C-alpha cells in the first residue's frame, strides 16, 4: 500500500496536484470575526461560563421589575391614610368574629367525636326514661 505523501509529486509531474478545499464556514467573514472575538475574550480572561448577553439582560429586567413592584407595594402601604388603616383593622376584627377559630374538638380524631356523641345519646335516653 503506497502512502500518499509529498514524495509522489517528485516522481510524476504529470499528475494533477490536489488543492486544499476551503471550508465555507471558516471562509465567511462573520465566522472569522466571531472566531477573532472569541480569541480576544479568551486572552482577556472572559470565560465562556458567563451567561449570554440576552439572558443577562432578561434577568436584569426581571430583577428590576420585582424591585419596582415591591417598592410600589411599600409606597401603597405608606400612602394609606389613617382612616383606611382603621377601616382595614375593623374589617379584620369583623372577619374574626364572624369566623371564630375552630375549637380543638374539630381537630380531634373521629373516634373521640363518636364516643362523645354516644355519651350524649345515652344521657338523653336516660333522661327520657326519667320523664
From Swiss-Prot:
<keyword id="KW-0131">Cell cycle</keyword>
<dbReference type="GO" id="GO:0150052">
    <property type="term" value="P:regulation of postsynapse assembly"/>
</dbReference>
<dbReference type="GO" id="GO:2000134">
    <property type="term" value="P:negative regulation of G1/S transition of mitotic cell cycle"/>
</dbReference>
<keyword id="KW-0346">Stress response</keyword>
<keyword id="KW-0206">Cytoskeleton</keyword>
<feature type="short sequence motif" description="Nuclear localization signal">
    <location>
        <begin position="61"/>
        <end position="71"/>
    </location>
</feature>
<comment type="subunit">
    <text>Interacts with ACTB. Interacts with COMMD1; this interaction stabilizes COMMD1 in the nucleus. Interacts with MAP1A. Interacts with PRDX1. Interacts with F-actin.</text>
</comment>
<dbReference type="GO" id="GO:0030335">
    <property type="term" value="P:positive regulation of cell migration"/>
</dbReference>
<dbReference type="GO" id="GO:0005737">
    <property type="term" value="C:cytoplasm"/>
</dbReference>
<dbReference type="GO" id="GO:0031398">
    <property type="term" value="P:positive regulation of protein ubiquitination"/>
</dbReference>
<keyword id="KW-0770">Synapse</keyword>
<dbReference type="GO" id="GO:0051017">
    <property type="term" value="P:actin filament bundle assembly"/>
</dbReference>
<keyword id="KW-0963">Cytoplasm</keyword>
<dbReference type="GO" id="GO:0003779">
    <property type="term" value="F:actin binding"/>
</dbReference>
<keyword id="KW-0539">Nucleus</keyword>
<protein>
    <recommendedName>
        <fullName>Actin-associated protein FAM107A</fullName>
    </recommendedName>
</protein>
<dbReference type="GO" id="GO:0043005">
    <property type="term" value="C:neuron projection"/>
</dbReference>
<comment type="function">
    <text>Stress-inducible actin-binding protein that plays a role in synaptic and cognitive functions by modulating actin filamentous (F-actin) dynamics. Mediates polymerization of globular actin to F-actin. Also binds to, stabilizes and bundles F-actin. Involved in synaptic function by regulating neurite outgrowth in an actin-dependent manner and for the acquisition of hippocampus-dependent cognitive function, such as learning and long-term memory.</text>
</comment>
<dbReference type="GO" id="GO:1900272">
    <property type="term" value="P:negative regulation of long-term synaptic potentiation"/>
</dbReference>
<dbReference type="GO" id="GO:0005634">
    <property type="term" value="C:nucleus"/>
</dbReference>
<feature type="coiled-coil region">
    <location>
        <begin position="57"/>
        <end position="77"/>
    </location>
</feature>
<dbReference type="InterPro" id="IPR009533">
    <property type="entry name" value="FAM107"/>
</dbReference>
<dbReference type="GO" id="GO:0070507">
    <property type="term" value="P:regulation of microtubule cytoskeleton organization"/>
</dbReference>
<dbReference type="GO" id="GO:0051895">
    <property type="term" value="P:negative regulation of focal adhesion assembly"/>
</dbReference>
<keyword id="KW-0341">Growth regulation</keyword>
<dbReference type="GO" id="GO:0031669">
    <property type="term" value="P:cellular response to nutrient levels"/>
</dbReference>
<dbReference type="GO" id="GO:0032587">
    <property type="term" value="C:ruffle membrane"/>
</dbReference>
<dbReference type="GO" id="GO:0045202">
    <property type="term" value="C:synapse"/>
</dbReference>
<dbReference type="GO" id="GO:0001725">
    <property type="term" value="C:stress fiber"/>
</dbReference>
<dbReference type="GO" id="GO:0005925">
    <property type="term" value="C:focal adhesion"/>
</dbReference>
<keyword id="KW-0966">Cell projection</keyword>
<dbReference type="GO" id="GO:0098871">
    <property type="term" value="C:postsynaptic actin cytoskeleton"/>
</dbReference>
<keyword id="KW-1003">Cell membrane</keyword>
<dbReference type="GO" id="GO:0071385">
    <property type="term" value="P:cellular response to glucocorticoid stimulus"/>
</dbReference>
<dbReference type="GO" id="GO:0001558">
    <property type="term" value="P:regulation of cell growth"/>
</dbReference>
<keyword id="KW-0175">Coiled coil</keyword>
<dbReference type="GO" id="GO:0030041">
    <property type="term" value="P:actin filament polymerization"/>
</dbReference>
<dbReference type="GO" id="GO:0050890">
    <property type="term" value="P:cognition"/>
</dbReference>
<dbReference type="GO" id="GO:0099143">
    <property type="term" value="C:presynaptic actin cytoskeleton"/>
</dbReference>
<keyword id="KW-0472">Membrane</keyword>
<dbReference type="GO" id="GO:0098978">
    <property type="term" value="C:glutamatergic synapse"/>
</dbReference>
<dbReference type="GO" id="GO:0015629">
    <property type="term" value="C:actin cytoskeleton"/>
</dbReference>
Amino acid at each position: 500500500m503506497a502512502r500518499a505523501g509529498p514524495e509522489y509529486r517528485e516522481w510524476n509531474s504529470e499528475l494533477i496536484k490536489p488543492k486544499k478545499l476551503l471550508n465555507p464556514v471558516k471562509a465567511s467573514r462573520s465566522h472569522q470575526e466571531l472566531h477573532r472575538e472569541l480569541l480576544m475574550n479568551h486572552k482577556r480572561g472572559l470565560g465562556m461560563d458567563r451567561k449570554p448577553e440576552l439572558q443577562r439582560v432578561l434577568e436584569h429586567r426581571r430583577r428590576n421589575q420585582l424591585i419596582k413592584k415591591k417598592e410600589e407595594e411599600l409606597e401603597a402601604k405608606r400612602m394609606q391614610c389613617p382612616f383606611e388603616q382603621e377601616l382595614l383593622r375593623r374589617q379584620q376584627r369583623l372577619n374574626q368574629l364572624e369566623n371564630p377559630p375552630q375549637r380543638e374538638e374539630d381537630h380531634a380524631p373521629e373516634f373521640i367525636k363518636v364516643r362523645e356523641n354516644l355519651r350524649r345519646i345515652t344521657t338523653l335516653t336516660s333522661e327520657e326514661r326519667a320523664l
